[in-house]
Amino acid sequence: MNGSNMANTSPSVKSKEDQGLSGHDEKENPFAEYMWMENEEDFNRQVEEELQEQDFLDRCFQEMLDEEDQDWFIPSRDLPQAMGQLQQQLNGLSVSEGHDSEDILSKSNLNPDAKEFIPGEKY
């Protein structure tokens, strides 16, 4: 091709290859490929609301777990140190089998002729 042929070609005429690369005709909206950005603010607002909602739920669950943790009685945490030592001493105690059952019955203040107690039954 010589220079005279190139000069006769008008710049406004595009080949099919050029139209394929840009994705649209000159008759179409030149900003068509950017139309997705039209709703970008709505999308961002929606994502931000979802993140705030998730953060709120996380904080609620953490607060609920903290309250539940406070409700539980944990001796090592809730008892003073002296009480903890007393608790250890009580855990070390055991009932001895050295007492004779006759000895216990002779010192008892219970009525041996009383009916046997059955819960829920009226006498």
UniProtKB/Swiss-Prot annotation:
Pfam families cross-referenced by the UniProt entry: PAM2
Start-end of Basic and acidic residues biased regions: 14-30, 113-123
Keyword Acetylation carried by entry: yes
GO biological process: negative regulation of translation; negative regulation of translational initiation
Keyword terms of this UniProt record: Acetylation, Repressor, Translation regulation, Ubl conjugation
Family in the record: Belongs to the PAIP2 family.
Assembly mode: Interacts (via central acidic portion and C-terminus) with PABPC1 (via the second and third RRM domains and the C-terminus).
Protein name listed in UniProt: Polyadenylate-binding protein-interacting protein 2B
